[in-house]
Regions:
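A short, aliphatic-rich beta-strand micro-motif
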Residues: 120-131
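Signal-transducing coupling segments at domain and membrane junctions
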Residues: 99-121
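Helix-loop-beta substructure at the N-terminus of cytosolic sensory domains
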Residues: 42-80
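Sensory beta-strand/linker motifs that couple input domains to effectors
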Residues: 133-143
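Allosteric regulatory "coupling" segments in signal-transduction proteins
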Residues: 74-102
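Signal-transmission linkers at sensory-effector interfaces
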Residues: 1-38
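Regulatory loop-to-helix N-cap segments in sensory/regulatory domains
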Residues: 143-159, 169-175
């Protein structure tokens, strides 16, 4: 009987944990929905990089977020997001098959942030047009918390955020 009670207790704890994860995922999905609506309601393409980054910061509590793009249409080449990436940045972003999450080990992308020294952990999310293999940009999320973006974390929601950001920002690419 004691063994059965222990098994039941273990199952109750697992069930409670599953419910908690479900609630967390629902909350993330709600924030994702609000941020997506913010992107869709942005009429001016030139405003999209700032709306995307500031919206992620606000809706998801990310202390720092920025976007860097390359190969944009001439009308958008003067935007801050289209300036300052090295010649290596496109190849680095394209090499990422999924978001990089981990420590800021002096990566170039951290220098694009307002306060690079405060970026202990990073999520670097490649931006691709549709199913194309080449990245046309990088979404950079940063936190002073070294565990916020850890190498062992799941990246499903970050991948969705990257897909949505890329879809919105593809308006800045040449026709």
């Amino acid at each position: 009987a004691e063994l059965l009670r222990e098994k039941i207790k273990g199952l109750e704890l697992k069930g409670a944990e599953m419910i908690r994860h479900g609630h967390e995922n629902t909350a993330i999905a709600d924030r994702l929905q609000r941020w997506t609506l913010q992107l869709l309601n942005t009429r001016e393409a030139a405003e999209l990089p700032e709306v995307a980054a500031s919206g992620i910061a606000a809706h998801f509590g990310v202390p720092q977020a920025t976007v860097k793009l390359w190969g944009v249409a001439p009308d958008f080449a003067a935007l801050p997001c289209a300036q300052g990436a090295s010649a290596d940045a496109p190849a680095f972003a394209t090499s990422l098959s999924k978001p990089y999450c981990g420590a800021n080990r002096g990566l170039e992308a951290a220098t694009w942030l307002a306060d690079p020294a405060a970026a202990a952990s990073l999520a670097l999310i490649p931006l691709r047009a549709g199913d194309g293999p080449q990245a046309f940009g990088l979404l950079v999320l940063a936190s002073p918390d070294p565990q916020r973006f850890a190498a062992d974390m799941g990246t499903d929601f970050l991948e969705r955020i990257g897909e949505l950001t890329a879809a919105a920002l593809s308006r800045l690419l040449p026709a």
